[in-house]
């Protein structure tokens, strides 16, 4: 059995998870244990492409065509966070990562941050949710038990 990649929304949350679950070794931009690889975003890493940035093959548009609701929204990396995105993309593509665990904040923005990363990476692994009500070690351990 491979490892699960846990993606938190921010580095402080990843650090709290590593401490609460124990057994992690800090590498450059992530933590690793026999069961898990643990890393984080730093808030939003990707954003929707503006219409003029959309690929031409999807067709040109003008304001006369509005409203336009495309079947697919293209994403682009946010420049200042590109290095962190690359860390996560490499982790997702690791051969030993066989599932992804969303440990981003439980609200809409946290879910969106995680889903954009998964979409951009074209990840095929199954996804699980680490739902954390608080950041206490006990709450994190309970959350892991219910993934």
Spell out what each predicted region is.
Residues 1-144:
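Intrinsically disordered, low-complexity regulatory segments
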């Amino acid at each position: 059995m491979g490892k699960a990649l846990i993606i938190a929304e921010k580095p402080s949350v990843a650090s709290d998870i590593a401490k609460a679950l124990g057994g992690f070794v800090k590498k450059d931009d992530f933590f690793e244990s026999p069961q898990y690889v643990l890393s984080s975003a730093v808030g939003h890493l990707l954003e929707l492409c503006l219409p003029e940035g959309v690929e031409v093959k999807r067709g040109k548009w003008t304001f006369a065509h509005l409203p336009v609701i495309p079947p697919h929204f293209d994403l682009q990396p946010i420049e200042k966070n590109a290095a962190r995105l690359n860390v996560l993309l490499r982790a997702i593509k690791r051969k030993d990562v066989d599932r992804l665990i969303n440990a981003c904040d439980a609200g809409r923005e946290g879910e969106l941050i995680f889903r954009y990363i998964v979409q951009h990476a074209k990840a095929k692994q199954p996804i699980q949710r680490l739902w954390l009500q608080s950041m206490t070690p006990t709450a994190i351990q309970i959350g892991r038990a219910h993934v």
